[in-house]
């Protein structure tokens, strides 16, 4: 009986730590969003972040030099709470949603690096602060993976 209580206590502690880690990364994402909103408002004082604009940005197809159309959703699926797969390499990609993946937004320098890399790769230039703010706001709303078929 004592052994069972110890196992339950350990499992509850692990679940609590996991929940705190996920919440910390959601908090990191929110902090980064505030930074981008502030920058965007220096460019356009009337800027207001938008989940709708973030979703449109995430799903926007851009014609690549090879003629193929790509979007963030091409690798990350249309639901950022789902795991994705790299369109070229087939490599598995963990979900983007920080509510689902407690490693997303853990390292904000890496987030900045990935924004620069992917924006230049797909759009051909760095994303604006407004685009980044909207993108993260959208990711924060996606908390439920799609049901498996």
Predicted regions and their residues:
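Post-cleavage N-terminal segment of exported redox proteins
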Residues: 2-55, 99-149
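Sequence context of c-type cytochrome heme-c attachment sites
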Residues: 52-64
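The canonical Cys-X-X-Cys-His
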Residues: 69-79, 135, 139
